[in-house]
Structure formats: C-alpha cells, structure tokens
Amino acid sequence: MAAAAPAAAASPEAPAVSGSADPETGDEDSREVRVLQSLRGRIYEAKNLLPYLGPNKMRDCFCTINLDQEEVYRTQVVEKSLSPYFSEEFYFEIPRTFQYLSFYVYDKNVLQRDLRIGKVAIKKEDLCSHSGKETWFSLQPIDSNSEVQGKVHLELRLNELITENGTVCQQLVVHIKACHGLPLINGQSCDPYATVSLVGPSRNDQKKTKVKKKTSNPQFNEVFYFEVTRSSSYSRKSQFQVEEEDIEKLEIRIDLWNNENLVQDVFLGEIKVPVNVLRSDSFHQAWYLLQPRDNGNKSSKTDDLGSLLLTLCYTEDCVLPSEYYGPLKTLLLKSPDVQPVSASAAYILGEICQDQKDAVLPLVRLLLHHNKLVPFITAVAELDLKDTPDANAIFRGNSLATQCLTEMMKIVGGHYLKVTLKPVLDEICESSKSCEIDPVKLKEGDNVENNKENLYYYVDKVFNTIVGSSVSCPTVMCDIFYSLRQMAAKKFPNHPHVQYSAVSSFVFLRFFAVAILSPHAFHLRPHYPDTQTVRTLTLISKTIQIIGNWGCQSRKKSRFKKSVMCEFLKMFQEERYFTDVKKFLDEISSTETKESSGTSEPVHLKEGEMYKRAQGRTRIGKKNFKKRWFCLTSRELTYHRQQGKDAIYTIPVKNILAVEKLEEGSFNKKNMFQVIHTEKTLYIQANNCVEANEWIDVLCRVSRCNHNRLSSFHPSAYLNGNWLCCQETSESTPGCKPCTAGIPADIQIDIDEDRETERIYSIFTLSLLKLQKMEETCGSIAVYQGPQKEPGYSKFTIEDSVATFKTIQQIKSTIEKLDEPHEKYRKKRSSSAKYGSKENPIVGKIS
C-alpha cells in the first residue's frame, strides 16, 4: 500500500516494521511487514531573495534538504544571484521516522558561518498533497520557534498524603521520562535539559532536570513533586478530590532548553498539560509533541524572503511477506508469452496507469529480475512497429516499449556510463575552457576560433570514447538491440539504414546524449553544472546526437537552422565518423556474448567523505575521529587522506565479515556504522542517516557472499577493556546480537521484487476505475462485434477483446485477494498507534 501516487523508483531496503498476517494461519505477528519510505523530486530555483544592503546586493546561494534538522542533501553554490537556478534532482531512501521535510536556503559565507535566508517546512502527513506537482513555496523565517521538533514522554500521578494531625494534602508527581527527536544545534546533537513548572493564577513553581550531554534523545527519568492544594483546605473526607476551581486553572508546563554555558540557552520547545487530566483518573501517561511558544513571533512579511520551486514525490510502501505476492507476480511474469501482448497484465498496467512512467520502473525491475524483460520489450516493440508507417519515425514516440527500454538502460547501464563517459565528463566539468561558438552569446574577451577548437576537441574525445566502448555494453542491452535491429529490417526491407536507426534512437538519443547533457542525473557528477558548463555539455550532446543519427542515414545533413552549428558540424562529415558509428552499432547489436557491464574490471560502487575512528588507539578526544575519503569497488574498500590521493588503508571485500550499525552511545555520535573484517573493526561516522544507510546497504551487498560472514555482532564498541553492549571483557567474545538479515547479492542491480510487486499492486489499486472502463470496453466489443465509438475507447489498445477481458478478470481477482492482508495490517497499525503513544503523540493541550 502506498501513501502517495506511485513513485518511479525503488532502491535498497529500509528498516522493517513488524506485524503482518501469515497467509496460512492469519497470525498477524508471525510475519514481518516492511515499511519503506522514499523521496524523489527536484529543486528547481529560488526567486526574489532578499538582497544585501549596500552596493553588492547579490548572494552566493545553496539549498539543503533536511529530515527534521538533519541535513541529507546539499546543492551546488550558485554565485551572485538573487534568483538562483539549481535544477537538481534527488532521490533517497528514508531510513527513519521524521516529522518535517525541510528545505533551507543559505547564503554562502567564506569567513563566517553560512547565513540561513529562509526555509520551507512540510509536515510528513502533508507530503502526499504535493506529490508530483511543481509548487512554489514561500520561504519562512527561521528562529527558535520555527525549529521546534521532538516529543516528550510524561507521567503524572496524584497522591494523597495524610499529615500527623489527620489532615489531607494532595501531591502532584511529575515524572519526565525521556525526549525523542530534539533538534540539532548548529548541526550537532544538543545538550538538553528540561524545566518543569506548575503554573496557576497565583503560583509558578519551577524545577529543573540535569543536563544531558550530546544527545537528541535524552533519557531524563527524573521525578518532581508539587503540592496541589494547601493541607488546611482539606479534611480526611476529601479523599482524592481536588476543588474544581483549582484544577481547572492549574497546568504543568515543560520547557526544553539547550545548555549553552557561556551564552543564552536556546529554546527547544514546550508542552502544557492541564492538571484536570487527573480528574477522572489519578494517573496519566503519554507522549506529547513539543510546541513553539504561544507568543512566538511570526513575521507578517514572510513573502519578502523569496520563494522556492520544488517537485516532490514521497512514497511509503508497506511490503508484505513474499508469499502474498506470488499470484500477482506469476500473472505479470507470464506477460511476454501472452498472445497478443496487449492482452497481458504488464501491458494493461501501462494502459490504465495515470502516468505510464509510474508503472514502467517497477515493471522493468521485476521483469529484469526474472530474465523476462528482453522478450517483453521485444513483444511490445513489435506492436509499436505495426503502427509505424514511416521508416524515419521508427521508435520516436513515447510508448510503453520506448519507456521500458529507456528505463532498462538507466538501470543496467550505470557502470557502463561510468567507465565510458565519467573521465571525459570530469575533464569537461573541471575545466574552465569556453566552447561557445555563437557570436551572439560570446562573453567579452572570448575568441570564436579558440572556442571552436575546444568544442571540437571535446566532441571528438567523447565520440571516440563511445564508439570504442562496445565491449563494455551490458549483455541485456545488446540482446534487446539485436531484437530491435532484426524487427526493423523485417518491417522495412527496402530501407537498409532503418536497422541502424532502431538502435541509434536509443543508445545515442536516449542514453549517451542524455547522460552528457545531465551527468548529475546519472551519478556521473555530484551536482548540476554551472551555466558555462551546461552550455558546453548542451553543444556536445547535440553534436553527438547528430553524428549518431548521420551514421544511420544514406544522406547526411544537419537539421540545425543556425548557420553557426551547420558550419561546426561540417568538421565531422568525414567518412570515418559514419563508419565508426555503424561499426559501433553493429558491435552492440550482435549476438556475440559481451562482458556483463564490464565486470572483468573492478566496479566502482560508491565514494564520499566520512569520519573514521583511529584504529588501535586508546586516547580520548576529537582527534580520534579523522575525516577521510572512502572509495568502494567490487574488490576493495579503501580510505584516503583526500580525494585523488593514494590509499592509506585497504580492506579487500573478501575479508569483510559483517557491516552493521553502531549504537550512538558508543562514542556519543550519530550515524555510525562498523565494518567488521579479519584484522580489526573499522568504525565510521557518516554525515547523515541517509548516507549511513546507503553505505551499509552497498557494503552488505558486495560482501554478502563471503564465506566467513558472521552470524552475530556487538552493537556497541569495545572500549576500556569491555564491550559496552554486553559488558564482556574479552575482545574475542562472539557477538551478542544476530547480524542483520542478508540483502540481495547482485551488486550491479539490487532489486527487491516484493517491493516492486507492491508498487504494481498500488498502481492497480489506484487505477481500478480505469481498469473497470477497459473491462466494459472489452465487453462492448465482444457483444457488438465491431469498433467502438464511445468516448474513451481510443485510449485503450485492445487487439483481442476476449483475451484482454480474461486477463482483467484475473487482475481484479488477484488484487482483491491482496486487499485483505493490507486491510488487516492497516487496522492493526491504526489501533496500535493510539493517541498519546510514541507513534501518535498528543498535539497541544488535552482536557
């Protein structure tokens, strides 16, 4: 089940949440339901930011994405602009619970701390309402009130005390147990404490907890006592009875603060609980959501801060155990063999989905996982060709076939792009050479002839890199290209060039040209490039696309209207370019076996800057943790003093025994994990929870098949002669906790087939009305034996109404059976998260 419109992606698993139904026994607790969250979207641009006061009004801006206050993504810096254009796409799994998704716009400051200009904060429950829409959000001011987050666990009790002279005194016991999810202060865990006050018309008794160091989840466990009424006001007969006028006016107020020592303490939030919650029961326990101050100042000129354009798609999938998805998977995996293919479940999915792109990714991943993708794409591509009368228009549309093939290339071609394009793209992006050849767009001091030479050098280098890369082309891509080529030649026997166009329209137009134009979207570069580099990449991409197209045609001519581009393209009209294109297309569309994604070479999997704890040292202090550049390939994990420097330390992948999270209490640091290997455990701190989750996932995948993997581990560190988790003194003591369950071993393509099937179930569920319409259309065709004229008929491709009708019936039956365990889980989840629980804390006052 999904909380939003289906997202077009699924990635490594996130933490699981227990509780589902066993398909045989119906036992809700005997299986595990995984609740997987993901977020994708784009940060487009900001507009009308406040200028600096003074002659230099421009700002150097960047934007961050934060889960609550934890930064998980940062854009590039756009210099000297009050309307910065970022255009950065993002996708990540969300490995923990959160209250707010926030976007902060900063002004970069070299000498001082970066200045926060404003933010957009969206409650988790409101994310679905923005799904898939381009939306302008007004930037809101940032102060201590706007940064409030977290919750408090509180227990109240009313006791009766009898004095020596027989009078009765009422005593209020306030037990502040813990807080969870307090905000970060300057990117670090805070030093929180709480003040506990009993407030009334004529009293304000205040007490204070101890300060807890470096934690966002403090465990206070402190009890405070307050006298509710004067003992003289009561006699023995007033047992557990408080005067109404007193109890209605009294309240417990808890304020959370960050201890700043030398400067003023920072407000973290407050809650107010009326004492009359004890009127009917002398005991009350609940979690409360922290709130801003009642008198929090809200700016009346929030629009003046500027605005931010975003697209968001938040998805929450509740993935049941594998047994439930068997019937739906079977129905989908039969699709390549169904005649005609338009009557298959996979094709019908693409027909009824509101946005076909939503259906393509889970479908492609599922079919790819079961080696069914090549025959399915071949079948739907053949259907496309039936409706293509012009050989020059082959595979130019945006059909199910072209979308499936395009998505497949993104999935399996990632490493192919890295070994082919990344080195030359790095050279282009890190160079300051101008390649502008349009005199109208030239900057002052630029020389057209020099720029033309620069552009020619880059285009020629990119071209030679591409046409020399056929040996690295993934086998599954070659197999599909071979099928496309054969079908095209059969369809248009009098047009020999069309067999090349069928392949070129994908590998040049939809693969290489797009990756050159947007390297950040293919993980070839960390950020969207600057304006000059964007222009250079655009010119290179267009030229490569044209040359690739020329190699498939009998006559070579430019489609560019601008004489500037036409003149430049003449430099590439040598016969060798056309010959090299055809040779390359021949090689990647042959039936000869290729290396699967170039796996004879080490596969580059992940790299980035993190902190590692010095190994084998006992000294205590910040210097024990050093910033290092980590690099993981399919063969080894290394770390370096800086990117590009020689490795300081190398761990062969075959020596990794386990990769697990490390408890925060070990070093009082968040987002830590441990790489347990044959020599010594390596403790690493990631920059945020998303990054930590990604590193753990990829390290687990690459080492999953190691023969000596551990079955248990220590969740805390070994310090001062004992394990902090189990207090064992021997460092060689076996682990006290079972290792995390294994992750799919394919380091190239990590596919969670249950999650993909759950996505497809969600799409079918959201599209039932359209499925019903398609079913009715099939019935009408069968009854009237002729073409339909009713509205909406033309939206469906129905070649065999009887076969299509039968498949729709099977889909509906399968979906109905899956609805039952989903509904059971929804009810259980709803009932378990009662108001006042940690999962569903109380907001504001209760009476």
UniProtKB/Swiss-Prot annotation:
<dbReference type="Pfam" id="PF00169">
    <property type="entry name" value="PH"/>
</dbReference>
<feature type="modified residue" description="N-acetylalanine">
    <location>
        <position position="2"/>
    </location>
</feature>
<dbReference type="GO" id="GO:0035556">
    <property type="term" value="P:intracellular signal transduction"/>
</dbReference>
<feature type="domain" description="PH">
    <location>
        <begin position="603"/>
        <end position="704"/>
    </location>
</feature>
<feature type="region of interest" description="Disordered">
    <location>
        <begin position="819"/>
        <end position="847"/>
    </location>
</feature>
<dbReference type="Pfam" id="PF00779">
    <property type="entry name" value="BTK"/>
</dbReference>
<feature type="modified residue" description="Phosphoserine">
    <location>
        <position position="554"/>
    </location>
</feature>
<keyword id="KW-0472">Membrane</keyword>
<feature type="compositionally biased region" description="Low complexity">
    <location>
        <begin position="1"/>
        <end position="21"/>
    </location>
</feature>
<feature type="zinc finger region" description="Btk-type">
    <location>
        <begin position="706"/>
        <end position="742"/>
    </location>
</feature>
<feature type="domain" description="C2 2">
    <location>
        <begin position="148"/>
        <end position="288"/>
    </location>
</feature>
<feature type="binding site">
    <location>
        <position position="726"/>
    </location>
    <ligand>
        <name>Zn(2+)</name>
    </ligand>
</feature>
<keyword id="KW-1003">Cell membrane</keyword>
<dbReference type="GO" id="GO:0046580">
    <property type="term" value="P:negative regulation of Ras protein signal transduction"/>
</dbReference>
<dbReference type="InterPro" id="IPR035892">
    <property type="entry name" value="C2_domain_sf"/>
</dbReference>
<feature type="domain" description="Ras-GAP">
    <location>
        <begin position="371"/>
        <end position="588"/>
    </location>
</feature>
<dbReference type="InterPro" id="IPR001562">
    <property type="entry name" value="Znf_Btk_motif"/>
</dbReference>
<dbReference type="InterPro" id="IPR023152">
    <property type="entry name" value="RasGAP_CS"/>
</dbReference>
<feature type="binding site">
    <location>
        <position position="736"/>
    </location>
    <ligand>
        <name>Zn(2+)</name>
    </ligand>
</feature>
<feature type="domain" description="C2 1">
    <location>
        <begin position="19"/>
        <end position="137"/>
    </location>
</feature>
<dbReference type="InterPro" id="IPR000008">
    <property type="entry name" value="C2_dom"/>
</dbReference>
<keyword id="KW-0597">Phosphoprotein</keyword>
<feature type="binding site">
    <location>
        <position position="725"/>
    </location>
    <ligand>
        <name>Zn(2+)</name>
    </ligand>
</feature>
<comment type="function">
    <text>Inhibitory regulator of the Ras-cyclic AMP pathway. Binds inositol tetrakisphosphate (IP4) and phospholipids.</text>
</comment>
<keyword id="KW-0479">Metal-binding</keyword>
<dbReference type="Pfam" id="PF00168">
    <property type="entry name" value="C2"/>
</dbReference>
<dbReference type="InterPro" id="IPR001936">
    <property type="entry name" value="RasGAP_dom"/>
</dbReference>
<dbReference type="GO" id="GO:0005096">
    <property type="term" value="F:GTPase activator activity"/>
</dbReference>
<protein>
    <recommendedName>
        <fullName>Ras GTPase-activating protein 2</fullName>
    </recommendedName>
</protein>
<dbReference type="InterPro" id="IPR008936">
    <property type="entry name" value="Rho_GTPase_activation_prot"/>
</dbReference>
<keyword id="KW-0677">Repeat</keyword>
<dbReference type="GO" id="GO:0005886">
    <property type="term" value="C:plasma membrane"/>
</dbReference>
<dbReference type="InterPro" id="IPR011993">
    <property type="entry name" value="PH-like_dom_sf"/>
</dbReference>
<dbReference type="InterPro" id="IPR001849">
    <property type="entry name" value="PH_domain"/>
</dbReference>
<keyword id="KW-0862">Zinc</keyword>
<keyword id="KW-0343">GTPase activation</keyword>
<keyword id="KW-0007">Acetylation</keyword>
<feature type="binding site">
    <location>
        <position position="714"/>
    </location>
    <ligand>
        <name>Zn(2+)</name>
    </ligand>
</feature>
<feature type="site" description="Arginine finger; crucial for GTP hydrolysis by stabilizing the transition state">
    <location>
        <position position="396"/>
    </location>
</feature>
<dbReference type="InterPro" id="IPR037773">
    <property type="entry name" value="RASA2_PH"/>
</dbReference>
<dbReference type="Pfam" id="PF00616">
    <property type="entry name" value="RasGAP"/>
</dbReference>
<feature type="region of interest" description="Disordered">
    <location>
        <begin position="1"/>
        <end position="31"/>
    </location>
</feature>
